[in-house]
Amino acid sequence: MVKRVAIVGAGVSGLASIKCCLEEGLEPTCFERSSDLGGLWRFTEHVEEGRASLYKSVVSNSSREMSCYPDFPFPEDYPNFVPNSLFLEYLKLYSTQFNLQRCIYFNTKVCSITKRPDFAVSGQWEVVTVTNGKQNSAIFDAVMVCTGFLTNPHLPLDSFPGILTFKGEYFHSRQYKHPDIFKDKRVLVVGMGNSGTDIAVEASHLAKKVFLSTTGGAWVISRVFDSGYPWDMIFMTRFQNMLRNLLPTPIVSWLISKKMNSWFNHVNYGVAPEDRTQLREPVLNDELPGRIITGKVFIKPSIKEVKENSVVFNNTPKEEPIDIIVFATGYTFAFPFLDESVVKVEDGQASLYKYIFPAHLPKPTLAVIGLIKPLGSMVPTGETQARWVVQVLKGATTLPPPSVMMEEVNERKKNKHSGFGLCYCKALQTDYITYIDDLLTSINAKPDLRAMLLTDPRLALSIFFGPCTPYHFRLTGPGKWEGARKAILTQWDRTVKVTKTRTIQESPSSFETLLKLFSFLALLIAVFLIFL
């Protein structure tokens, strides 16, 4: 029986894994190579080897209500989008609340994780670590790898002819910390993901000129969405997810395009995605269109050639003088402490069932947590993965035969990546909620909306039509949280409370009352059609 579990990494997913093990009676031991917990969210002035790095101004792209642990809401005085320093504070509050730090060995590097000679029977692993120069070895019944995928920068210099002749400065976005280096410089940022766009916008406040080069474009949305609410609380609902899955792709694409262009016309600003037939990960930035329209940021196509002090873009013969190039070209991932026979990474993909279990292992005692890029927050995603894994380790739920798991893995691999970043699976980008529900179903933790509609209709309607907040995931099943119902029904109150710092007297409107009545009737009709 699985008892002792090794956990690699004390970031968002590592902390969740420790807690999930503890609440099910397992004995977790977490190895963290740095001096403190927090992973990505712990800002340092210098880049640390083997640890994700962020810049000083990073703010969460998922809102507070959508990116908390399912049974541990953010403090109510936190802003709706959380700066990195407060996010780290939240993780420490989580660790303290559930007494997780007692399970963590800091300044400890995992050197190797290998199968024991009797692995086919025992499923055990030997974990070799180094702490302050001293090597240690221990045997564990299972391993949960929580190292993330933002530590190995992807810098494809051979894709940029002439880069080695460039006399200016160039570096990967992982190295970026502060915008001061751009003062009075001509800056080129390559790659229009979240980091690339953030850096270009920050640079535009100090630089002489800023170019943002993109190959495929992107949908750009603001954190502030309909009526001023957080974007994901409006966009990520079970009702909308159902529509996106049921409606024909051309209709979904048209609806998404119309919604994305309601802020600004992406074609007119030169940022529209080349492929608009699927919902790719949007770029979250509140300033970009304003910087473009005021001539502070110039959108450019891919690079044709780099010269000593300038760059030539495709389809634009003019040379643009450049002093600094920032490559926001994504990351690759690897597991240097694992043999390739355990987890093999090819073309930016690993053969992991549900992005978690190596499909070929005879014993499912090694799991990778957080190696996924859903269109939603990593915090509840990683926590749900960890919760599912612990149930598998306990034997409370079982995996399909290896052949079935490999079939799913191979089907996923057909989604080839483009651009410079990770291979983001189309299904998971579109169906974040579906992915979470799939894991919850296998541990009997998915909310039963049909039954709930009869016993608690207010909650059922809130779950179906309202934002898919993480509290849904701990409403039932093993490890359910008694505060989940209240958290769901009060989520909008908390969202408004933190912004409504000046009270304004609102006059009642009979029209609004009538509109609400008709809206309620429409909801009842929709529920009737969907559930009956």
UniProtKB/Swiss-Prot annotation:
Catalytically driven reaction(s): hypotaurine + NADPH + O2 + H(+) = taurine + NADP(+) + H2O; hypotaurine + NADH + O2 + H(+) = taurine + NAD(+) + H2O; trimethylamine + NADPH + O2 = trimethylamine N-oxide + NADP(+) + H2O; N,N-dimethylaniline + NADPH + O2 + H(+) = N,N-dimethylaniline N-oxide + NADP(+) + H2O
Binding site for NADP(+): S60, N61, S195, G196, T197, D198
Main location as per UniProt: endoplasmic reticulum
Cofactor(s) of this protein: FAD
GO annotation, cellular component aspect: endoplasmic reticulum membrane
Side Lumenal, residues: 1-510
Protein name from the UniProt record: Flavin-containing monooxygenase 1
Highest classification ranks of the organism: Eukaryota, Metazoa, Chordata, Craniata, Vertebrata
Gene: Fmo1
